[in-house]
Amino acid sequence: MSTAPTVTPERSNQTVRKTYPNYKVIVLNDDFNTFQHVAECLVKYIPGMTGDLAWDLTNQVHYEGQAIVWVGPQEPAELYHQQLRRAGLTMAPLEAA
């Protein structure tokens, strides 16, 4: 009685790493928040936000109806979104970038 040789599939030594998706934090225009309040909130809650960039984004919110104020991993995106919403800003739902 002969036995057939056993074939063992080769295992790949390469690890495939999937990156986590980024999310966009988007502020929407409204009729009750002042430019000053929006800009101050952006500087307060978005890391690395400068006053000049906050004013540019605030103008974009006003004239274009919305602005993407931060893009990055989901967990901090959820935090910044929640902080801005609690400060009274009108926020779009988080979107995958």
Curated annotation (Swiss-Prot):
InterPro entries: ClpS, ClpS_core, Ribosomal_bL12_C/ClpS-like. Binds to the N-terminal domain of the chaperone ClpA. Belongs to the ClpS family. Involved in the modulation of the specificity of the ClpAP-mediated ATP-dependent protein degradation. The gene is clpS. It comes from the Bacteria. It comes from Nostoc sp. (strain PCC 7120 / SAG 25.82 / UTEX 2576). This is ATP-dependent Clp protease adapter protein ClpS. GO terms for biological process: protein catabolic process; proteolysis.
